[in-house]
Amino acid sequence: IVGTWLAASKTIELEEIHRFGNEQKMMDGHLRWDFEALFNELKTGLKKAFAKYGDEIKSIGIDTWGVDYGLLDKEGRLIANPICYRDDRTKGMMDAAFQKLPKEEFFQHAANQFMEINTAFQLISETDLQRAERLLFMPDLFNYFLTGKCYNEFTRASTSQLLNTKTHQWDDVIFEKLNLPKHLMQEIIYPGTMIGELTAELAAEV
């Protein structure tokens, strides 16, 4: 989508540039998002936008659904395609979490609606944590492949059930009680934050 600011009417005009399908696929025993395919579609959209508007494009913003994430290894490579929130690996994980951190206390730290799809419960069942160096939520993952920069954007982080409601930072108690590696999490940034430019390689491609 290309958005054009119309100063006279103080409105934004939206134009669809590229549309594509997106379905979860069963890979390695789990329902996963085909990240490479999605990123290729994103690049196609950028190519179309730049072909039509060129230097008139002043910024790029990424938005996706919440709770799902990708893990990067020490070399900055995506370990595996992100597992979809509809995968059944989280069944029973919420009750398992409440054995370590009672529901009422949990809610005092992260006042989210309790759902098994939330990131906290996905991570309890995650098998790649030992290999992981960074966790990026879906929009953060696209931003990383666009710019090379690693951040966790606040609105997506807020769906994780790992963010303290009052401080808006990662909650030490939740990570400690659930035995989750807090070092995977990145600096929190807010919507509209400028994080960088397209990598030279990607800029040449699009």
Regions found by a protein language model. Name each.
Residues 35-42:
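Phosphate/oxyanion-binding active-site loops and adjacent basic polyanion-contact surfaces
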Residues 1-35, 77-85:
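Short glycine-rich, Thr/Ser-proximal phosphate-binding strand/loop in the N-terminal lobe
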Residues 47-206:
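Glycine-rich phosphate-binding/catalytic subdomain of phosphoryl-transfer
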Residues 21, 43, 47-50:
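Short amphipathic alpha-helical segments enriched in leucine
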